[in-house]
From Swiss-Prot:
GO terms for biological process: positive regulation of translational elongation; positive regulation of translational termination. Gene3D superfamilies: 2.30.30.30, Nucleic acid-binding proteins (2.40.50.140). Functions by promoting the formation of the first peptide bond. It comes from the Archaea. It is found in: Cytoplasm. Keywords: Cytoplasm, Hypusine, Initiation factor, Protein biosynthesis. SMART domains: eIF-5a. Its main location: cytoplasm. The gene is eif5a. GO terms for cellular component: cytoplasm. The modification Hypusine is found at K36. This is Translation initiation factor 5A. Belongs to the eIF-5A family. GO terms for molecular function: ribosome binding; RNA binding; translation elongation factor activity; translation initiation factor activity.
Length: 130
């Protein structure tokens, strides 16, 4: 489980953050100053990478949050088994299975190279190469 800790004020739209134990892509950040003596608060809205659920949190801008270390890799399709696909990583030659996203179901054939991401022990197929 690779992650690092940063302050909320360094987060940007399009980057990733861990909310409720899930890696999520930030879709919106808004900050507000509550008053004369209060510290600024940030509201961060994000969508889960692996489950597509909307999540959000409100924290002071100087508080710390975890961000995932996302590893983008290339793999080759070995076999297609119903709703799952068996892939082999082209660097480590490790084989694993992952669900097929709806938008890639027509493009996947055996032998084609694909890109996938790995974060917090989970993998997701992103797109075909070429």
């Amino acid at each position: 489980m690779s992650k690092k800790v940063v302050e909320v004020k360094t987060l940007k739209v399009g980057k990733y953050v861990i909310i409720d134990g899930e890696a999520s892509k930030i879709t919106n950040i808004s900050t507000s100053s509550p008053g004369k003596h209060g510290s600024a608060k940030a509201r961060v809205e994000a969508v889960g990478i692996f489950d597509n659920q909307k999540r959000s949190f409100v924290k002071p801008v100087d508080s710390k949050v975890d961000i995932p270390i996302i590893d983008k890799r290339t793999a080759q399709v070995i076999a297609i088994m119903g709703g799952d696909v068996q892939l082999m990583d082209l660097e480590t030659y490790e084989t694993f299975e992952t669900p097929i996203p709806d938008e890639l179901s027509e493009q996947l054939v055996e032998g084609v190279e694909v890109e996938y991401i790995e974060a917090l022990g989970q993998r997701k197929l992103m797109r075909t190469k070429g």
